[in-house]
Amino acid sequence: MDSAGLHINFRLSHVLTVVTCILYILPPTTTAYSLPAPGKAAFQHQLSKRDVSDGSAERRPYTRMGSGGLKLHCQVHPANCPGGLMVTKKSDLLGALLSRNSPSSYGLPSRDMSTAYKRQDVRQQLRMFDDLVQLRKLIETPSVYPSEEDEARLYD
C-alpha cells in the first residue's frame, strides 16, 4: 500500500473512533441533563409510607415532648425511632430516653452490654493471636524444647 492509502485508513479509523465515543457518551449525558431538578416530587416514589409524615403525627400526644419539640416519627416501625425504641406514650418516651444505657423493657440490649461483648471478643482474639505467636516461636526454634509451663499455657 502506498502512503495515501495508509493516510485514508488512518483518517477513517480516527473518524470511526470519534463517532463510537460520541455514541457511547452522548445518550447518558443527555438523559442526565433531561431529568427534573431534584426536589420533593422527584423522590416521592422512593419513600415508603413510614418515612413520610402525613401531618397526622402532629396531633398524636406521644410525638412531642415539652417545649423542646422532640418529634418521633416511629409510628409504624421501630427502626425509625432513635435507638430503635417503639414508644407509644409520653411517659414511656421519657423513661426510654432517661434509661438509654440500661436494659430496656422492650427487649433490646443496651449499649454497654454490646460493647462489653465486643471487648470480650477482642480479648479472646488477642489471646488466640498471642497463642499463635508463641506456637510459631516454638516451631521456628526446634532445637529448644518448651518448658512444662509453656506447654501448660499453650494447652489451657
UniProtKB/Swiss-Prot annotation:
Organism phylogeny: Eukaryota, Metazoa, Spiralia, Lophotrochozoa, Mollusca
Q: What does this protein do?
A: The alpha-1 peptide acts as an osmoregulatory peptide, increasing blood volume, and also modulates the activity of a set of cardiac motor neurons that control heart rate.
One of the GO BP terms on file = neuropeptide signaling pathway
Tissues with expression? Expressed within the abdominal ganglion in neurons R15, RB(HE), the two L9(G) gill motoneurons, and L40 interneuron, all are parts of autonomic control circuit that contributes to implementing a central command to coordinate autonomic activity with escape locomotion.
Q: In which compartments does the protein localize?
A: Secreted
Prodomain residues: 27-48
* Range of residues in the leader sequence: 1-26
Q: Where does the UniProt entry say this protein principally localizes? A: secreted
**Cystine pairings recorded for this chain:** 74-81
| Extra information | Isoform R15-1 produces peptide R15 alpha-2 which is a 24 aa long spliced form of peptide R15 alpha-1 which is produced by isoform R15-2.
- Key words of the record: Cleavage on pair of basic residues, Disulfide bond, Neuropeptide, Pyrrolidone carboxylic acid, Secreted, Signal
Gene Ontology CC terms:
extracellular region
- Carrying Pyrrolidone carboxylic acid, the residues are 120
Protein name per the record: Neuroactive polyprotein R15
